[in-house]
Amino acid sequence: MLSLRTSISRIQPCLFIRASSYQTEATQPKFQDKIRIRIQGGDGGQGCSSFIKEKFRPYGPPDGGNGGDGGSVYVAVKPGSFNNLSHLSQIHKASNGTNGKGGNRHGSCGKSVILYVPPGTVIREISAVRSEQSLEWVQMPGKTKPPKLKKGQISFVSEATRHGKELLYYRASSMISGAAEYSLEECDTTPQILCYGGVGGLGNVHFLSENNRSPKFATKGLTGEQKLIELELKTICEIGLVGLPNAGKSTLLNCLTASKSKVGEYEFTTIYPKIGTIKTTMPDDHSSFQYRLADIPGIIKGASDGKGLGYDFLRHVERAKMLCLVIDINPKAKIPADQAFQLLWDELNKYEKNLINKVALVIANKADTAAEQDLLLLKAIVERTTKGVAVLPVSAKKQEGLEGLVRGMTQLLQQRLLV
């Protein structure tokens, strides 16, 4: 059997900060990492047409308040609360603003909606319904038809319309949509707007003029935006563990982070990404350093073309700072170690050429069952294919070589973070 240079008897798991896989697959809700949902901002409330009531005066000065703005739809990251997108419903609508009232009382704004998502979520706008916003009038109660115009009043009506449009444009200028794609990192905990609510209508006090001292009309509020958006989770982690099914990635993650990933002797035990956190102490200054480690579902030949689970989950390693290829070097492995490495290398290269530049370490797992020759064959093909990528033998099952592995991953990651 192969003797591990960095072998240790038993090591305690590194301090566990959080693993998104704390529950087993059997107890977790359905995993969703790509969904489409409809979002809609609330409509603005109507402006009010009213007057101050005074004795012997049918219409005092106008005092109609504005309608409240409709609520908007926001998105924000909530670290540690979600590990996928299954908690989001298909439709999210903000509340409408309430109507204005007499006495210059403005309507209240509608309640906004915040969509909380895990870090690593990308949001794309698929389509948007932006109806042409026109100025619609609201008459005083009991006056369903526009008042008949007398001679000389046409100029006033056109002036009021122009003034109303200017005011609404000024109030609605913030409704100009932003970027069509958002990429949310762990630091994006401040809500970002996705869909604006409509601004409230104008009360009749805005239409007081020399030509009309008793304006008996107000305006309706504008409608809120409507959008169809797509949310895609691309897991954020510093290091991604990539390997064929049954290479021992889940066992490795469990040992290093005290995660609770499911382990089995059949293919595709892991059916969605699991994340654990390694916390270690640097030997030079004894400072604390932590990073996230992701167990990516097993990749098979043709994964870059959509076969198996690979196509859906290869995107989860796109944002990783560094990749570690986990190779089973057990002589009884279904695919020999050298062929397994070449297969993984080819699939990563086909999916996105930049991914192979992230490969910094090859972990030769199950080294306690392998001979020296098996490790030498793997090292030979790695040296021919890569530029300076090291091969480190470990045994996750027996927890041998893990201390050296953590030390090596930490050093390599720090080097990449400094670039």
Swiss-Prot record:
GO terms for cellular component: mitochondrial matrix; mitochondrion. Pfam families: GTP1_OBG, MMR_HSR1. Keywords: GTP-binding, Mitochondrion, Nucleotide-binding, Transit peptide. Coiled coil: none annotated. GO terms for molecular function: GTP binding; GTPase activity; magnesium ion binding; ribosome binding. PROSITE patterns: G_OBG, GTP1_OBG, OBG. One of its GO terms (biological process) is mitochondrial large ribosomal subunit assembly. It is found in: Mitochondrion. Residues 237-414 form the OBG-type G domain. Residues 29-236 form the Obg domain. InterPro entries: G_OBG, GTP-bd, GTP-bd_Obg/CgtA, GTP1-OBG_CS, GTP1_OBG_dom, GTP1_OBG_dom_sf, OBG_GTPase, P-loop_NTPase. It comes from the Eukaryota. GTP binds at residues 243-250, 295-299, 364-367. Belongs to the TRAFAC class OBG-HflX-like GTPase superfamily. OBG GTPase family. PANTHER family: DEVELOPMENTALLY REGULATED GTP-BINDING PROTEIN-RELATED, MITOCHONDRIAL RIBOSOME-ASSOCIATED GTPASE 2. This is Uncharacterized GTP-binding protein P8A3.11c, mitochondrial. It comes from Schizosaccharomyces pombe (strain 972 / ATCC 24843) (Fission yeast). The lineage of its organism: Eukaryota, Fungi, Dikarya, Ascomycota, Taphrinomycotina.
